[in-house]
Amino acid sequence: MHPYLTGNIPGTGGIFKETPEDFLVTEIPIYTPCGEGEHIYAEIEKRGITTLEAIRRLAKALGIGERDVGYAGMKDAKGITRQTISLPRVAPEQVLGLELPGIKVLSAVPHRNKLKVGHLRGNRFRIRIGGVGADAATIAIAVLDILEKRGVPNFFGEQRYGAQGNSHLIGGAILRNDYRGAVDALIGEPDKVTDERWRRAIEAFKAGDLAKSLETFPPHCRTERELLQKLVKQPEAHEKAFRAVHPRLRKLYLSAFQADLFDRVVQQRMDSLDQVVHGDVAFKHDNGACFLVTDAAAEAPRAAAFEISATGPMFGCRMKEPEGETLAMERRLLETEDLTLPSFDLEGGLRMEGERRPLRVPIAEIGVEADGAGLFLEFSLPKGSYATTVLREVMKS
């Protein structure tokens, strides 16, 4: 469990995501489509499905390849999400005429280029917390005031780690070429799931009955089923079986491993989250550039003004390294995983170059509104940052 930046303030408690309407996220785009070109930028509202599942449904309905579909940010299945998807070689009328479960097309405008991951400014959130006390709004305002001044700890959200919270374990096994371990981690543990059929499928796998496991896995566990179909034929060919996993998912597992290591660094730096030290690689919030801190005292006013922040590692074979004690700490972390930076130079389109990620991010457009026994929070965060971190600080649960 991550520590709190606002641990001296009690939480509101309560629950959220009781209904999809309790969690609304809207992408903030960098640019709008120009009105001409072979790609259609479709703003969709999805409900109860992931971005990848939305892409599958759209691609199938339009007869295009999933890999040809572009998106700026990955969103999970919970709540309601409004985001833009790019679709090649189709007419706006085709897209606007779609009627698909879990997806509503809000607009469709042509553009010249495919939408790339990261092509968004951030996300705006409107979240309802239910079952809170009469002082919840006062508590939330106090917490958000500190987060506005010091920054939001840039932890990755739990959705980064998958339904069982094990995606980083799969990614770590891939990096160590431990494909038996990767398969075991992907199938997971029976006590991590609540679906009875899913639990029995995992237990059958653990008992070595691959055929029964394949037969028992629910249809929505598509990746597990595809992997087991290979293993049933060749039980010891773990690496070959793992190739059945969609390349996008393999990338997600590797990214989850990066995220786990980064989160550990944030935990270690929590008390000094709004400071920089000698040897840090600092991040400029106005343009995303990074530089090495050689005079921490001289840079302290810029950190206090939220112009710059210390960064942590998203490890990769070409990642810019810090110096001094910051470097020593990051290398110790890699050593605990029996890895070095060259370990991330993978083949098969899985090469991870790495980057620096700020340890904190600004929160903006803050709003708090009492709603009977509930509480509405509104705020925006930069791309790649998670609302769940803000909710943890507010709710302390």
UniProtKB/Swiss-Prot annotation:
| Keyword field | Isomerase, tRNA processing
Molecular functions (GO terms) = RNA binding; tRNA pseudouridine(13) synthase activity
Catalytic reactions of this protein = uridine(13) in tRNA = pseudouridine(13) in tRNA
Query: Domain of life here?
Result: Bacteria
Q: Which GO terms describe its biological process?
A: tRNA pseudouridine synthesis
Instruction: State its Enzyme Commission number(s).
Output: 5.4.99.27
EC class of the enzyme, as a word: isomerase
List each copy of the TRUD domain by range.
151-361
The record's Pfam families line, in alphabetical order, gives: TruD (PF01142)
What is annotated as the active site? 76 (nucleophile)
Output the InterPro entries linked to this UniProt entry.
Answer: PsdUridine_synth_cat_dom_sf, PsdUridine_synth_TruD, PsdUridine_synth_TruD_CS, PsdUridine_synth_TruD_insert, TruD_catalytic, TruD_pseudoU_synthase
Report one GO cellular component: cytosol
**Purpose:** Responsible for synthesis of pseudouridine from uracil-13 in transfer RNAs.
Family classification? Belongs to the pseudouridine synthase TruD family.
Protein known as: tRNA pseudouridine synthase D
**Organism placement in taxonomy:** Bacteria, Pseudomonadati, Thermodesulfobacteriota, Desulfuromonadia, Geobacterales
